[in-house]
UniProtKB/Swiss-Prot annotation:
Protein name as annotated: 3-hydroxyacyl-[acyl-carrier-protein] dehydratase FabZ
Keywords tagged on the record: Cytoplasm, Lipid A biosynthesis, Lipid biosynthesis, Lipid metabolism, Lyase
GO biological process: fatty acid biosynthetic process; lipid A biosynthetic process
Main localisation: cytoplasm
Protein localization: Cytoplasm
Annotated organism of origin: Vibrio parahaemolyticus serotype O3:K6 (strain RIMD 2210633)
Family: Belongs to the thioester dehydratase family. FabZ subfamily.
The encoding gene: fabZ
Enzyme Commission code(s) on record: 4.2.1.59
Family matches, as HAMAP family: FabZ
CDD domains noted in UniProt: FabZ
Functional note: Involved in unsaturated fatty acids biosynthesis. Catalyzes the dehydration of short chain beta-hydroxyacyl-ACPs and long chain saturated and unsaturated beta-hydroxyacyl-ACPs.
MF-aspect GO terms: (3R)-hydroxyacyl-[acyl-carrier-protein] dehydratase activity
Amino acid sequence: MTTEKKTMNISEIQELLPHRYPFLLIDRVIDFQEAKYLHAIKNVSVNEPQFTGHFPQLPVFPGVLILEAMAQATGLLAFKSFGAPTENELYYFASVDGAKFRKPVVPGDQMVIEVEFLKERRGIAAFSGVAKVDGEVVCSAELKCARREF
C-alpha cells in the first residue's frame, strides 16, 4: 500500500482561491485527503505589508491572518473534496469559535496549517484547525465556512 502525499503548488492553489497578493496566505499544500484533512504551508517574510504597522519595532504576524490562512486552507479542502467553485461562487469565512493564540509568529517562521473536515449541513462546513511553527501549536480554532453564489 502506498502512502504517497497529495500536494498542490501555488498555480494549483490560485486556480481554486480568488485571493491574490497580499492576501493569498497559502504558499503550498503539502498533503491532503478529500473530505478528511489538508496540510499547507505559509512562509512568513519580513517583506509582507502588515509588518510596517504590526509592529515596526517587533514584527508579529497578526492573529486574524493566521485564522484567515486556516480559512483559505478549508476552502482548498472543500473545493478538492466537493468540486471547484463556479464563476459566480465564493467560499465565505462564516464563523470562528474557541480561537487560542499560544505563541507569536514572527518573520522567518514557517507555519504549517492543518485543517480537518468535521461535518457539513445546509451548505455550511465545519472544520477544526491548528497552525504550527517548528512542530509547536501557535493557534487553534474551530471554523465554519459557507459556499454561496453571488
